[in-house]
Regions:
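Beta-rich accessory regions
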Residues: 1-122
Length: 122
């Protein structure tokens, strides 16, 4: 999918393993880390039983796209999830339960416009 952020500091991500009765779920969040336009993909445990940011499980720093357009690709084999931003910047995490539960695209501040959403199964 493509996400167009409304501002330089928009924070958004994808949540996985979101069932109707879960007290915690996992998210890969594109987070503005510094005022100079650098971003990082953070791994967070959200929900009422979640821990929030999981220290030591975050991604590498990458530059904010000048036009605030993020082309996001997510691949999974049902236990390992890899997220790519603009075909270059990636993050991989083992997350069990992705094949049995709902996913969501979230915006935590600002706004995002989603387009080109495509799902493929092999």
């Amino acid at each position: 999918f493509t996400a167009k952020a409304s501002s330089d500091d928009t924070r958004f991500g994808v949540s996985l393993c979101r069932s109707t009765d879960v007290k915690k779920y996992y998210s890969l969040i594109v987070n503005p880390e510094w005022a100079n336009g650098r971003r990082k993909i953070n791994f967070e445990q959200e929900g009422e039983g979640g821990k929030g940011f999981i220290e030591g499980a975050d991604g590498y720093i990458f530059p904010r796209p000048a036009d605030n357009v993020y082309n996001v690709d997510i691949y999974t084999d049902n236990s390992v999830v890899t997220m790519y931003i603009n075909g270059v910047y990636g993050y991989t995490q083992r997350i069990y339960g992705t094949q049995k539960n709902c996913w969501s695209i979230n915006c935590y501040n600002g706004q995002i416009e989603i387009s080109n959403l495509s799902l493929t199964q092999y």
